[in-house]
């Protein structure tokens, strides 16, 4: 961390957890186990120490959003209607975005009773493999040009204006958009949008996804640490795919394990690390809230925008 974070308060885990005194985690160990991603070591103590204070902070931002919306409606002499509260979550592959997103979805739904909380990943806005192949950029999958950013922005605008939207579904098992299937998002009270690209600028530099976010989170760690988690996850995915020929990762189980891991290291070095350093990490200071992880996914520091 450097002067890039001059506009952030740096808060240790010990100081952060003292900002919230509740000792009940709002979920059980079994529920936490069911939502955490492969090789993510999050535990109930992390929920109490990190995520319950974060929920309190989100409540503050939510009240601020409601007050501003109400005041603007009075000023403009327009009818006030409740817009969804949109949370953007970004970070590298394998850093734990999905676990954080699913956990927040559960905690928000239990904190804001009767609220409709939707979770969407930007994977659904990747171009189908067929189009990536046609454009000669299948090896750039995950990079900015592999996403249909216009459709993603249109989706956010639709949701922000209280209109039901239908979006594509991505499957990690087939490594592609699922044909002829759509996810329906019906006017949520909260929308969590998770993906590596949620803070990135658009090519025309006229529209910015951040403009639609009421709160934003970046999950950070040292790059060598993320590489270790990526390789651990790759190995776990191979184990899951071993008996399933339809799984994208099954083909990697047909070569010697050391060759598969060499391939994974090459994918990390030539694709994921390049994407992280060039396109993902430079956007982290656009977040309102940065979660920094050390070894074993242990959250050691928080950065909160001033």
UniProtKB/Swiss-Prot annotation:
Pathway: Cofactor biosynthesis; coenzyme A biosynthesis; CoA from (R)-pantothenate: step 1/5. The gene is coaA. This is Pantothenate kinase. Belongs to the prokaryotic pantothenate kinase family. It comes from the Bacteria. Gene3D superfamilies: P-loop containing nucleotide triphosphate hydrolases (3.40.50.300). It catalyses: (R)-pantothenate + ATP = (R)-4'-phosphopantothenate + ADP + H(+). Coiled coil: none annotated. Its EC number is 2.7.1.33. ATP binds at residues 91-98. It is an enzyme of class 2 (transferase). HAMAP family: Pantothen_kinase_1. GO terms for cellular component: cytoplasm. InterPro entries: P-loop_NTPase, PanK, PRK/URK. GO terms for molecular function: ATP binding; pantothenate kinase activity. It holds the Pfam family PRK. Keywords: ATP-binding, Coenzyme A biosynthesis, Cytoplasm, Kinase, Nucleotide-binding, Transferase.
